[in-house]
Each structure stands twice: as structure tokens, then as C-alpha cells.
Amino acid sequence: KIYSTKPTLSLAEVILNNTTRILREEFELEFDKSMISNYKEETLDIIPMIMKRCDYNEKVFLSEVFNENISFEFFDAGHILGSASVLINAGGKKIFYTGDINLRNQTLIPKAELPKHKIDILITESTNCAADNYPDYKEETGRLAAFINRVINKGGSVLIPSFALGKSQELLMRVHTLMKKNIIIVLIVTCIITA
């Protein structure tokens, strides 16, 4: 079984099909062509059948998999739609695992939820783990508005490269809000998604 949050399962079909296409193209160009058979679209058809949707904060018991009393629950990681950290209860210990996590509210995604009780082991990605100098949301939005206005007032065009999932939607919402509040002029916004 594959356990996931409901939003992740909803996005999985699109993301997995895209990933499969990219991997097939890369293998055709750079690797042993016999490996391509591992990345067939038909293989993806079984994924929805083996995925189990879980709500955030829903305790899921894995007794059918393990003979021991092992459970887990997802916590919203506040990173992108469907992102989750996981609290695993096993052998009387609490293990909290998280990848990317955001401890501040975004325009579209609320900040991460964390367990309210003591954990025994923390496993985390650490790109910004010890950073305490994150830019202020309002200051960064102000800098974005000033940049856009400066470029547009000089007759230029604004190009903002961004990840297709999560960050693009956040940027579009910020730009929309800035236009709605007349902080920046109304722009023609074009999104180009490339793989």
C-alpha cells in the first residue's frame, strides 16, 4: 500500500504521468534503453488501486502489515498542497519525519502543524533547518511589488521563473492581490509550464 494525504492522491496521477514521460525521455537520451520498460504509463494505472487516502491527524494502524502495534499520522507540512510530515509510533517511541516544512502561513497554504507532544526522534531535511533569518512575508511582497513596478514603468516585461507545483500558485495569488489592491498596475499574466 501507498499511504498519502487526499490532496497528494489527487495530484499523483498528473505528477506521476509527467515524471514517467520525463524519465523515459532521459533514459532514451542518456541511459540503457532496456531500462525504459520500467517507466511505462500502464504501470501507473495500478497506483490508485494501492493508494490509501489519509486525513491529516488521522491515526493509521499498520497491524495488517506488522505484528507489532505500529501507527502513524500525517501532519500538514505547510509546504505545498498535500505535503505532509509523518509521526510514527513504534515500539513505544515517537519518530517525527519531515521533508520540506514551512512554519509561516502562505497566501494559499497554512503553516505547518507540529505534534503537540514530545517526540523521541526527529528526522528532517536541513536545507534551512537552522536558519532564523527568513524574510518577512510583507517585506518580500513589498519588494516584489517594487520590482514589478520598476520594470513595468521602464517599459519592460516581468519574467518570474518558478516551480510548477506550489510556488507558481503562490506567486500568482500574490500578484493578483497586489493588482486588486492597486499596488501594482494590472498585468497580463502568462504561465508557461515546462518539464
Each model region followed by its residue ranges:
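His/Asp/Glu-rich metal-coordinating catalytic cores
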Residues: 1-170, 176-181, 188, 192
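Ligand-binding beta-strand-loop-alpha-helix segment within the catalytic cores
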Residues: 195
